Every structure is written in C-alpha cells, then in structure tokens.
C-alpha cells in the first residue's frame, strides 16, 4: 500500500513531469493557450502513458535488452497512432487545434523516460498506475497553465469545450470578463513561459512551507513531555 501511495504522490506532485522534471515543455508551452486544448492534450498523454507502461511492463521479460529502446518507441508509436485516430474520429475540432502535437507524443521524453525508468522494472499494475499518475500530474499542470492564459488573455474559461466533449459542453463556457482586445502576451509563447515560471515559483514556495511545517512538527515530537519549545 505504501508503494502505491508513493507512486501516486510522486506522479502528481513530488516528481511532476512538468513542474519538477521539466519534460515535454514543447507541447506544454505551445498548446496551453486555452483550457480545452490543454485538457485534451493532457488526457491524450495520460492515456498513452498508461497503455504504453502497461504493455511494456507486460512484455519486459521477452524484450531483449540490446534493442529495448526501438521496441519501446514502436509500442509508443502504435498507441499514439490509435489515440490520434480516436481523436480524429470523435473530436475533430480538437484534432485540428492540437495538430502536430498529437503524433509528437511519440518523442515526448516523459513517455520514453517512464518506460525505461519504471515500466521495464515493475509489474503491469504498478506500471499502469505510474503512467496514469505521471499523466494526471502533467495534465493538471497543463490545465492550470491553459486556464490562466485563457482567463488573462480572453477573459473566458472552457471556450471551445464542445470540441473536446461534444455539443452539450457549450454550456461549460464561462465569460469571466468581457474584452474587445485580447491580451496577446498571455496567449503567445512569452505568456506561456511567464506562466510556467510563476507556477514553478508557486510549487517551490508550497514545498518549502510544507518542509518547514514537517520540521517544526518533528521538533515538537522530539521535546520532552510538558515542554513547548517556546522561550
């Protein structure tokens, strides 16, 4: 149970692929102009990570060590192709928005890295959980960045959600404030870099505060009964 919890915590927070490892920054920065695009690419990446980790872990005993990387890439490419066809068939608007970044998941360092570092050494169930956790962590980072850029740039949230979820999702669109002149800095690549930098700083501050609280709690437990540690 502790190993399962550790895999989840590592994927979502401690070893977040976007905010800690800084992997897959090209699609992270390019696609997150809206919350819908960010969520779409994040879900696709999560699905690819989960399925490839599961497949590679299942086949790990029959994979020759000398040619394991080409085999991993072939498995990843097959899964990405299937996901790309699904998006093309059921979410064509999103498929057009994401464009080349869907097939580029094949070369994403996150996917290959988890295959080599985790799936090739662990069992199928734990590997699938690792892929899902890493993908969910990346999706959360993409979604937060995409939401911030969309709100600041256009004053909306979930604009174009129907491209991802169907026509019913038009009701999800929220206009935070009205603007006739979008704030282009937030929508263009410089805004993505600035937003990511602020998110990295925010995570660092949260980690430092949590570390300080744990140190204070440990110090209090170490004190003899009846002492508070106050002067």
From Swiss-Prot:
S-S bridge residues = none
Q: Quote the subcellular location field of this record.
A: Cell inner membrane
In Pfam terms, one family for this protein is Rnf-Nqr
Membrane-crossing residue ranges in chain numbering = 18-38, 39-59, 63-83, 86-106, 125-145, 182-202
Q: How does it sit in the membrane?
A: Multi-pass membrane protein
InterPro entries tied to this protein: NqrDE/RnfAE (IPR003667), RnfE (IPR010968)
Q: Which UniProt keywords apply?
A: Cell inner membrane, Cell membrane, Electron transport, Membrane, Translocase, Transmembrane, Transmembrane helix, Transport
- Hydrolase as UniProt keyword: no
Q: What is its main location?
A: membrane
Q: Which residues form a coiled coil?
A: none
GO BP annotations listed = electron transport chain
Instruction: Provide the Gene Ontology terms for cellular component.
Output: plasma membrane
- EC number(s) per entry: 7.-.-.-
Q: Could you say which enzyme class this protein belongs to? A: translocase
User: How does this protein assemble?
Assistant: The complex is composed of six subunits: RsxA, RsxB, RsxC, RsxD, RsxE and RsxG.
List the PANTHER family: ELECTRON TRANSPORT COMPLEX PROTEIN RNFE, ION-TRANSLOCATING OXIDOREDUCTASE COMPLEX SUBUNIT E
Say which family it is in: Belongs to the NqrDE/RnfAE family.
Query: What biological function has been recorded for the protein in this entry?
Result: Part of a membrane-bound complex that couples electron transfer with translocation of ions across the membrane. Required to maintain the reduced state of SoxR.
- Put simply, this protein is called Ion-translocating oxidoreductase complex subunit E
* Organism of this sequence: Shigella flexneri serotype 5b (strain 8401)
State the encoding gene: rsxE
């Amino acid at each position: 149970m502790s190993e399962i919890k550790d895999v989840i915590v590592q994927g979502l927070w401690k070893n977040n692929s976007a905010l800690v490892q800084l992997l897959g920054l090209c699609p992270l920065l390019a696609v997150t102009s809206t919350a819908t695009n960010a969520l779409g690419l994040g879900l696709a990446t999560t699905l690819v990570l989960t399925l490839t980790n599961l497949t590679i872990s299942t086949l790990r005993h029959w994979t020759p060590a000398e040619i394991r990387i080409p085999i991993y890439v072939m498995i990843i490419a097959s899964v990405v192709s299937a996901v790309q066809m699904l998006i093309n068939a059921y979410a064509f608007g999103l498929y057009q928005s994401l464009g080349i970044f869907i097939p580029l998941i094949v070369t994403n360092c996150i996917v290959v890295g988890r295959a080599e570092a985790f799936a090739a050494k662990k069992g199928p169930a734990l590997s699938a959980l690792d892929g899902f956790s890493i993908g969910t962590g990346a999706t959360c980072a993409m979604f937060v960045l995409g939401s911030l850029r969309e709100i600041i740039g256009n004053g909306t949230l979930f604009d174009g959600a129907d491209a991802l979820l169907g026509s019913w999702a038009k009701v999800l669109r929220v206009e935070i404030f009205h603007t006739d002149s979008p704030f282009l800095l937030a929508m263009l690549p410089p805004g993505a870099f600035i937003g990511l930098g602020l998110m990295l700083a925010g995570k660092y501050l949260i980690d430092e505060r949590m570390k300080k609280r744990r140190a204070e709690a440990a110090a209090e437990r170490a004190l003899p009964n009846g002492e508070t540690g106050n002067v």
